[in-house]
A protein has these predicted regions:
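Accessory beta-strand-rich segments of carbohydrate-active enzymes
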Residues: 1-55, 78-80, 158-160
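Beta-strand-rich ligand-recognition modules
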Residues: 1-14, 18-32, 104-108, 112-131, ...
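Surface-exposed loop/turn motifs at beta-strand-loop junctions within extracellular Ig-like
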Residues: 19-21, 89, 145-149
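Extracellular and select intracellular beta-sandwich modules with Ser/Thr-enriched
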Residues: 39, 105, 153-157
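N-terminal carbohydrate-binding accessory modules
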Residues: 56-57, 142-168
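Short, solvent-exposed loop/linker segments at the N-terminal edge
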Residues: 60-68
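Beta-strand-rich binding/interaction modules
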Residues: 67-111, 119
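Cell-envelope/extracellular polymer assembly enzymes that use nucleotide-activated donors
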Residues: 139
């Protein structure tokens, strides 16, 4: 990733990319036997607001009795403001139809926290529905980031599942 902000001017800008055939990572670029030159993978250009999340760690955990769970979040942000965190139960994913049981979802919880730097959130989820390959039950975690003036800056959504794996 590269920060381009200092090089941008108002109006139209031109982005030029120089591609080298051989790099330190040549072995990695050649592992699939692609012998092409140029850019052969996706390239993205993102505009990121001053107040935004730049690192998100999501840990859905299930209790030993498999009836309840805990959702732990570690969020790292730039700028100051607040974040609204919402967990929505989407239901079982119907793979044949590529849709959820309840497309609109059912809110499990929502909370709003002040945000500046690092934020740790831990929230219990009662009557948690477990995810498995046979029953792909998903939740949607939605994080809305607001700046200090209360204006929405970005929305980050992630599908998550609660499961427990152990060997006894």
């Amino acid at each position: 990733e590269f920060e381009l902000t200092p090089y941008l001017k108002d109006g139209e800008n031109k982005l030029a990319v120089q591609v080298f055939k051989w790099t330190i990572g040549s072995w990695c670029e050649d592992q699939d036997f692609f012998r092409f030159s140029g850019i052969f993978r996706s390239v993205y250009l993102y505009m990121i607001p001053k107040t935004h999340l730049y690192d998100i760690k999501i840990r859905p955990q299930v209790a030993e009795n498999l009836s309840c769970g805990t959702l732990e979040l570690d969020l790292r942000s730039c700028g100051s403001g607040s974040v609204r965190i919402q967990l929505v139960e989407r239901g079982r994913l119907d793979l044949a139809e590529s849709r959820y049981e309840t497309p609109e979802g059912t809110e499990v919880f929502a909370l709003e926290e002040k945000m500046e730097g690092t934020l740790h959130v831990s929230r219990e989820v009662a009557d948690v529905k477990l995810w498995s390959a046979e029953e792909p039950y998903l939740y949607e975690l939605r994080m809305e980031v607001y700046d200090a003036a209360g204006k929405m800056q970005e929305v980050v959504a992630s599908k998550i599942g609660f499961r427990r794996f152990e060997m006894k």
